[in-house]
Amino acid sequence: ILTGSATPNHKGILHSGAGRIAKLRMRPMSLFESGNSSGDISLKDICEGRIEPKISGEVDLRKLIDFIIRGGWPANQETTLKQAAYLPIQYIRAVLDDDVYRIDNVKRDKHKMELLLRSLARNEATTVTNKKLKNDIKEIDDEDIDVETVSAYLDVFQRLFLTDNQKPFEAKLRSSIRIKQAEKRHLSDPS
């Protein structure tokens, strides 16, 4: 297994790896993978109609908040919450300082990228449009950003795996009911 960057340096590579190397997307750990969920309730079972009532116990709000702050980072699972909160901050800083430029050698406004990431966090799991993100930044941060810039920055975030949008549900039925066709916007990790 080889792991690598979203912005690999292709200079000097004589072989693409075609037929030998498969690319796969690595995501942060789920609560089950980190040992913080029993896995008793399966999304697969729910989708297949096998729903059995289960007692999950009391859900502690503070514990849920801790899980969100800690995120799915493997290195964060055994650290203090204060240390765990520091890792995503440093990760975002490193991505904005280095990877954003390296992806295509284009200079971008780091401050506006930070504002857009904050706006995405405020609009997590919604079908917010680029124009609404622009308006959110203006309303909350009192900063102007062009809609085309929002679109370009969202593309960079997607290519750097900072976002992981959810495709809309597509029913294979003919119906008079209109289903929303926009992607739900998600950051790759809640932390």
PLM regions and their residue ranges:
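Conserved Walker B catalytic segment
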Residues: 1
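Accessory nucleic acid-recognition modules appended to NTPase machines
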Residues: 81-191
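Surface-exposed, flexible loop/turn segments at secondary-structure boundaries
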Residues: 7-8, 171
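Active-site metal-binding loops of divalent metal-dependent hydrolases
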Residues: 5-6, 190
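Interdomain motor-coupling "hinge/lid" segment immediately C-terminal to the ATP-binding subdomain
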Residues: 4-5, 11-122, 126
